[in-house]
Amino acid sequence: MSRRTDIESALRRLAPRIPDHEFGAVLDHALDSRGLRQAAPEEAAWLSLVAYVRHVFTDYDGLRDQDFDEDSARFFVAEEIEAVLTGWGVRRRLATED
């Protein structure tokens, strides 16, 4: 199987109810991110999913623009991220480093 197929499968398992247009954006991020090229497909799918939700569905970037450090900004948006992920059928929970 190709890396694309492996990540697609991992993402479908992680987020079975993710809308198709969001699925494509998360998949593209997982495939295009230099930092994820060596990651296992499951890890690439998870990290891309969390990053996508953080930047698209929360005020994370606004908090960073207000000089919140990365950890603080992530803390303040964690519940919003969890809500979106839960809506997409994700059972995995955020870890402190996510």
Positions of PLM-derived features:
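Structure-specific DNA junction-binding interface
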Residues: 1-98
